[in-house]
Amino acid sequence: MTRPISFVTGNAKKLEEVRAILGPKFPRELLPVKLDLPELQGEIDDICRKKCLEAARRVKGPVLVEDTCLCFNALKGLPGPYIKWFLEKLEPEGLHKLLDGWEDKSAEAVCTFAYAPGEDAEVILFQGRTQGDIVYPRGCRDFGWDPIFQPKGYDKSYAELPKEKKNEISHRFRALNKLRDYFVAENQ
């Protein structure tokens, strides 16, 4: 029997969303594991690789970590991988206000999943990107910066969209599609 993958998260909403997107036919079992990993600085791919290797070392087995960025084009990619800290300090209104002096309200949501089959194994990255705009906070406020991100082609923020719709278009959906394809192919 294949060993379950430890999915490093302490966020129940994220776990729920990941399981909903992967669906019941995903060929591996995901077990949530809460680890206090170091908050690294740098570029998203490097951050994800390092976090994944540290998690694999601690778990001593297959591990999956996720990192999300929200990149404001007017701010040359900031807050980027530091979105968690910006959101914690500024809340959605403050994030929106960061762009007050800028005409360009466009942004890119980036989700990167990093998988390592074990300690000292090569890390595989699965990345999804969604273009959109930063809007005044609208909708439910129970999931991070969803109230301020409006994906291109939609007139609603992530928070205003039905979960099923968001889970068909989001940056996380795009990354998880790649991850699912990898594991389905590996299972054949």
From Swiss-Prot:
Cofactor(s) essential for the protein: Mg(2+); Mn(2+)
Enzyme Commission number(s) from the entry: 3.6.1.66
Origin superkingdom: Eukaryota
Positions bound to ITP: 9-14, 51, 67-68, 84, 143-146, 166, 171-172
Localization, UniProt: Cytoplasm
Annotated function: Pyrophosphatase that hydrolyzes non-canonical purine nucleotides such as inosine triphosphate (ITP), deoxyinosine triphosphate (dITP) or xanthosine 5'-triphosphate (XTP) to their respective monophosphate derivatives. The enzyme does not distinguish between the deoxy- and ribose forms. Probably excludes non-canonical purines from RNA and DNA precursor pools, thus preventing their incorporation into RNA and DNA and avoiding chromosomal lesions.
Protein name, per record: Inosine triphosphate pyrophosphatase
